[in-house]
C-alpha cells in the first residue's frame, strides 16, 4: 500500500466572512504549520514526550483539578477526594490552598458565563451578531481560565494517581446480552428516527470558517444528560455535504483558548464547502460528571467505561446523521482522531444494518487500530497510566478482556465501500499501535490513494494535518465538495 502524500494539497476556498466585532476571531496560526519547524517537531520524539506529559502531568493535574471542583474549595474535602490524609505543609500547601480558592472562583464565573451564553444562543428573539460574538467570547474565555486552573496543583503531581480508578471485577460486569448492539458491536441504533430526541439548533453566529451554531438534544444513551455539538457551515453553499468529526480522549477544544483551535483542523473544511459537526463526547466538556475531568470515567472504569462511551456516542451520532440529512446533506461522512476514530470505525460496522438514510457515506480514520487488546496491554499511554496493572489487580486476564473486546472492535464490514474510506496512520504510533491500523486498512481493502502512511507517532500524525492536509483534501474530493 502506498501513500497519497506526494500529491499537492487542494485549496478550494469558499467565501470567508468579514472580520470585526461582529465575527468570531480566527484561530491562532500555529508555527508548526510551516517548515522547517513543523518537519523538525512533528516526529516520533514529539510523541514520546507527549505521552509522558499527558500521563505524568496533564492527567494528574486534571485529577487534582476535578477534586478541587468537587470539594467546593474545602481543603479537607479536597484531600479526601484525592485519597490524601491532609494537605501537604509548607509552600506546596500554600499553593494548593490558593489554587482551591482560585478554582472555586473561576468555576463560579464560568457557570455565569455559560448560563448567559445559553440564554443568548438558545433564547427567543434575534440577538445581534455583536451580542452573540460577545457571549461566545466571554464563555470561551471563562472556560479557558477554569481549565487552566490545573496549574495550581502542580506540586501534587507525584502524590496522586492520574485517575480515580473504578474498574469492576469481571464477575461484576453486565451480561454480554445487555451490551450487545448492532453488527456484533456494542453500539445500538436508539430506535426509529421518528422517535429520536428533538434537536435544538442555536442562533447562528459569523465565524472564521463561515457561520457556526450549536446543537443540543437529550442524550439517548445517557438518561438525564444532554448531547452537544458545534456546527461549522460554509457561506453560500446550498445543502453541503457533512462531516461529523469525533475528538480524542480528554480533548475539549471548545473549552480552551484559540490556540487549541489550531490543533483541530476539521472545522476549516467548511472553507472547502463542507458542513462540519464537532460533537462534545460523553463525559467531556459540559458533560463532565461531578468529581471527574473530561474523559476520565472511560479510562477509570476500564473495559466497562469504553463500552459505555462507545454505546452512548454511537447513539448520539445516529441522531446527528439524521439531523444532517434533514438539513439537505446528500453525503454524510463520519470520522475522528484516536478515540474518535475508534468510535467511528465501530459505528461504521454497526450502521451496516441501519436504515439507508442513517448510514454514513464515507469514513475518515486518523490514528486508529482494530486491535484494542494491543491498545490496552501494549499501548504506550495505557502503560504510562498503569492500566494493565490495574486490570490485573481487579482479576482481569487477557481472556476476560478479549471477551468484551469483541463488542469494541470493528470485526465486521463497514457500511461504506472501500473507496469511501480514508485512513491516516503513523508508522511510529505506539499508543494505538500501527500494526492494528494497517491490518484494518488491509482487511477493509482501503485503496492506496486513500491510505496515508506517515513516519510519525500518535500525536504528531494528527497534529500535523494542519501542515499536511492531503487526507482531508481527499475526503473533500470523495464527498464532491473540492
Where do the model's predicted regions map?
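N-terminal targeting or regulatory segments adjacent to alpha/beta-hydrolase or S9 domains
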Residues: 1-211
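Short, surface-exposed "cap/lid" segments of acyl-processing enzymes
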Residues: 220-290
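Short alpha-helix in the alpha/beta-hydrolase fold that links the catalytic acid
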Residues: 259, 346-347, 419, 433-443, ...
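Alpha/beta-hydrolase active-site loop
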Residues: 290-327
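Hydrolase active-site cap/lid region
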Residues: 346-396
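Acidic catalytic loop of the alpha/beta-hydrolase fold
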Residues: 371-372, 427-432, 458-459
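Short beta-strand/loop motif that positions the catalytic acidic residue
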Residues: 416-417, 423-425, 429
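C-terminal catalytic histidine-bearing segment of alpha/beta-hydrolase fold enzymes
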Residues: 438-482
Amino acid at each position: 500500500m502506498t501513500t497519497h502524500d506526494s500529491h499537492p494539497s487542494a485549496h478550494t476556498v469558499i467565501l470567508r466572512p468579514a472580520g470585526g466585532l461582529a465575527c468570531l476571531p480566527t484561530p491562532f496560526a500555529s508555527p508548526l504549520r510551516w517548515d522547517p519547524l513543523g518537519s523538525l517537531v512533528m516526529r516520533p520524539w514529539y510523541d514520546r514526550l507527549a505521552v509522558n506529559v499527558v500521563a505524568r502531568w496533564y492527567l494528574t493535574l486534571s485529577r487534582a483539578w476535578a477534586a478541587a471542583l468537587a470539594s467546593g474549595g474545602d481543603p479537607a474535602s479536597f484531600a479526601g477526594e484525592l485519597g490524601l490524609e491532609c494537605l501537604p505543609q509548607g509552600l506546596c500547601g500554600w499553593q494548593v490552598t490558593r489554587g482551591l480558592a482560585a478554582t472555586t472562583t473561576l468555576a463560579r464565573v464560568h457557570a455565569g458565563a455559560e448560563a448567559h451564553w445559553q440564554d443568548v444562543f438558545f433564547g427567543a428573539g434575534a440577538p445581534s451578531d455583536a451580542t452573540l460574538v460577545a457571549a461566545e467570547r466571554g464563555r470561551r474565555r471563562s472556560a479557558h481560565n477554569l481549565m487552566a486552573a490545573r496549574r495550581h496543583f502542580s506540586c501534587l503531581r507525584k502524590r496522586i494517581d492520574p485517575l480515580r480508578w473504578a474498574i469492576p471485577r469481571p464477575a461484576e460486569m453486565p451480561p454480554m446480552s445487555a451490551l450487545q448492539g448492532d453488527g456484533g458491536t456494542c453500539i445500538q441504533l436508539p430506535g426509529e428516527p421518528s422517535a429520536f430526541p428533538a434537536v435544538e439548533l442555536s442562533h447562528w453566529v459569523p465565524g472564521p470558517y463561515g457561520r457556526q451554531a450549536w446543537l443540543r438534544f437529550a442524550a439517548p444513551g445517557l438518561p438525564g444528560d444532554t448531547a452537544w455539538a458545534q456546527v461549522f457551515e460554509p457561506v453560500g453553499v446550498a445543502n453541503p455535504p457533512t462531516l461529523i468529526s469525533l475528538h480524542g480522549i480528554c480533548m475539549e477544544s471548545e473549552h480552551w483558548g484559540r490556540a487549541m483551535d489550531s490543533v483541530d483542523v476539521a472545522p476549516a473544511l467548511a472553507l472547502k464547502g463542507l458542513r462540519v459537526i464537532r460533537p462534545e463526547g460523553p463525559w467531556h466538556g459540559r458533560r463532565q460528571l461531578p468529581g471527574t475531568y473530561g474523559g476520565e470515567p472511560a479510562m477509570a472504569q476500564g473495559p466497562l467505561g469504553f463500552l459505555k462511551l462507545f454505546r452512548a456516542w454511537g447513539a448520539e451520532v445516529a441522531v446527528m446523521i439524521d439531523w444532517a440529512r434533514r438539513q439537505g446533506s446528500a453525503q454524510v461522512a463520519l470520522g475522528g482522531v484516536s478515540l474518535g476514530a475508534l468510535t467511528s470505525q465501530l459505528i461504521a460496522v454497526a450502521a451496516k444494518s441501519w436504515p439507508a438514510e442513517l448510514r454514513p457515506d464515507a469514513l475518515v480514520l486518523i490514528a486508529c487500530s482494530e486491535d484494542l487488546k494491543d491498545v490496552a496491554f501494549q499501548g504506550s499511554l495505557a502503560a504510562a497510566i498503569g492500566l494493565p496493572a490495574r486490570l490485573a489487580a481487579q482479576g482481569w486476564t487477557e481472556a476476560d478482556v478479549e471477551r468484551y473486546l469483541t463488542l469494541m472492535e470493528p470485526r465486521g464490514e463497514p457500511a461504506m465501500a472501500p473507496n469511501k474510506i480514508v485512513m491516516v496512520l503513523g508508522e511510529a504510533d505506539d499508543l494505538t499501535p500501527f500494526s492494528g491500523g494497517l491490518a484494518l486498512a488491509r482487511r477493509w481493502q482501503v485503496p492506496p490513494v486513500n491510505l496515508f502512511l506517515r513516519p510519525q507517532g500518535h500525536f504528531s500524525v494528527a497534529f500535523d494535518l494542519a501542515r499536511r492536509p492531503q487526507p482531508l483534501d481527499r475526503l473533500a474530493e470523495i464527498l464532491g465538495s473540492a
